[in-house]
């Protein structure tokens, strides 16, 4: 059975959930300029280092370059990313993990907006902590520490 082209109706969400429960993984596509593909590739290398590739490939089909605001497009299982937003591979990878968590919540029928953002941010922080512990690159460790510090200084209500 093929993964639904769009994930919009109850039936499409149900089919997506069933396929994921059976172990379905997307062949992640990165669509954009060569500079965009390189920058997303660097972020994805960090996702691989932390061991989160399966998580992303379970819920995200495409990471696409756009000229508007970076965001999750649930109905397309896609992350839309503006090239200018890609300036720090650790932060970029964290954004991908955060949006993947939101997609997971959407498919599972959990609240994925409003206060659920806290859950997605916590997943992002978990990822950065894991990356910090798994990487051997001192510069990446430093960026992880800076990233975690920045996120700990942003209290949620």
Give names to the regions the model predicted.
Residues 108-147:
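Post-HExxH zinc-binding segment in Zn-dependent metallohydrolases
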């Amino acid at each position: 059975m093929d993964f639904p082209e769009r994930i919009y109706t109850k039936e499409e969400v149900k089919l997506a959930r069933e396929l994921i429960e059976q172990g379905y993984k997307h062949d992640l596509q990165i669509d954009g300029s060569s500079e965009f593909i390189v920058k997303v590739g660097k972020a994805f290398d960090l996702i691989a280092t932390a061991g989160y590739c399966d998580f992303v490939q379970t819920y995200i089909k495409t990471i696409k370059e756009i000229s508007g605001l970076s965001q999750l497009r649930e109905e397309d299982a896609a992350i839309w990313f503006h090239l200018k937003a890609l300036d720090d591979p650790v932060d970029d990878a964290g954004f991908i993990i955060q949006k993947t968590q939101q997609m997971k919540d959407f498919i599972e029928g959990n609240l994925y907006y409003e206060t659920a953002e806290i859950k997605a941010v916590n997943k992002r922080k978990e990822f950065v902590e894991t990356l910090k512990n798994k990487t051997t690159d001192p510069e990446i460790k430093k960026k992880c520490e800076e990233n975690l510090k920045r996120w700990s200084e942003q209290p949620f209500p």
